[in-house]
Amino acid sequence: MKAGLLRTQFSYQNTVVREKMKEKTKESVSAVVPIMLIVLLLGFTMAPLSPSILVEFIVGAVLVIIGMVFFSLGAELSMTPMGERVGGSMLRTKKLWMIIAIGFILGVIITVSEPDLQVLAGQVAAVPNMVLILSVAVGVGVFLVVALLRILIGIPLAPLLLVFYAIVFALAMFVPKGFLAVAFDSGGVTTGPMTVPFIMALGVGISSIRNDKHAGNDSFGLVSLCSIGPILAVLILGMVYSTEGNFTTTAITEVSDSVELGKLFLYEIPEYLKEIALSLLPIVVFFGVFQIFAPKMNKKSLMKICVGLVYTYIGLVLFLTGANVGFIPAGNYLGSVLASLSFKWIIVPIGMIIGYFIVKAEPAVYVLMHQVEELTSGSISGKSMQISLSVGVAVSVGLSMIRVLTGVSILYFLIPGYGIALILTLFVPKIFTAIAFDSGGVASGPMTATFLLPLAQGACLAVGGNIVTDAFGVVAMVAMTPLITLQILGVIYRIKDSRRADVPQTVTPVVDMFAELSDDAIIEL
């Protein structure tokens, strides 16, 4: 009888995993296929692609889809429960020094583990790689501590953002132009697929221990504060190091047959196997040590996390291989061809269309959307968030292409953009502010770094611009505009909620995604 019960339980778990896999596959296909169709349409019309680049892109897209499926499922099974457990246990200790120490160490570890940071460090020739990586990691560690203390003390997020961004822009006035775009890019790059699931779950774990009505609001906001640390770190480095250094253009590898194509991808896979293993190892070691001192998990939960880590590992290896080998050359080539046309302005609307769809292919976006839906009981739907993010990224890519064509300083876009975003914090519910500033770091992930940035770099070379000052900054722009669009979503929510309050009690109002909860208590955990 016991054996039969175990078989039934095992069968049920397999069914759940299969259903989850189907759901993740559907999400991944719907996210990547539109990008494939856009690139193919351009390749067969105004921006002809060589057969080599085209086939590399298609194979890369398939790997990206498979990688997204495994990563999304793996993050849900491992990163999220690990983060929630660590966060809850930290608060239960009731020892401030321990919370500060663990928060700082954790911030440094997960930042050094972020694959995108390695890419950024390699592109900043003026600063030694290890110096940049450690500086950014310390920045994230410090601001993760600030974010944790904010949750514990109950400090509103908006005033902190106002103060820290005022410091950021004050420092920016004294930094050479060559460091500005890279500094703001670093804020988006470091909150990538490795960092976001863990940090967000950490916030959920800590806020869940609190019993007050604002605990749910405070589940968000950690990613937004952690994004500030890297910006400040690179700005400070800009005051120490010179801006001298050469930028290396992307090499496009031509393949003549299917054997060479296979070798091209297989040659890169061992590198990413090693890179992702080194990225995951510090987190696994930290959690293992944590398990020794914290109350033990049951074997079933621990096994689930181990399986999730394997899925995460496989997913990130496949995703980064496909994105780096297949997407970077295609993005770079498309940018150079479109910007070389007599009507080069066409790259602005085309960039906006690509930006609208490409954010859906960011792995961490789905982690954020699912967590928002779960914690708000569906009051803020994933679909409304996705549309807001897509519109924001579309606008940011359009503005980035205008920068590439005109050479206008990034500060002329960032200062008004962040100014508008910070002003909006005064008029929207607190949870929308926290989610909006979190989403900026989430939207600017590996797809931005491996397709949108090469697109801008290719266009910049074609028009004879400065790569460092004009092409870099795309990540920063992508991280900025969702702050505005998602808070506009909050304004819409507030208007709809006030209209609902004006409806007489005898009339049953139509309930939509923006009007399911009161304005003062959007979340009750």
Language-model segments: residues:
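Juxtamembrane and boundary regions of transmembrane helices in multi-pass small-molecule transporters
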Residues: 1-7, 147-162, 177-178, 210-255, ...
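Intrinsically disordered, low-complexity non-transmembrane regions of multi-pass membrane transporters
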Residues: 1-28, 83-97, 211-222, 241-270, ...
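Alpha-helical transmembrane segments and their helix-start/interface "positive-inside/aromatic belt" motifs
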Residues: 23-31, 55-61, 89-97, 157-162, ...
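Hydrophobic core segments of alpha-helical transmembrane domains in multi-pass membrane transport
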Residues: 31-46, 60-70, 102-109, 139-150, ...
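Transmembrane helix-loop junctions in multi-pass membrane proteins
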Residues: 41-55, 75-84, 109-124, 143-154, ...
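Transmembrane helix-loop boundary segments of multi-pass membrane transporters
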Residues: 55-56, 74, 121-133, 150-166, ...
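Transmembrane helical segments that form the transport core of multi-pass membrane transport proteins
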Residues: 56-59, 253-364
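Helix-loop-helix junctions within the multi-pass membrane cores of secondary transporters/permeases
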Residues: 87-89, 96-167, 345-425
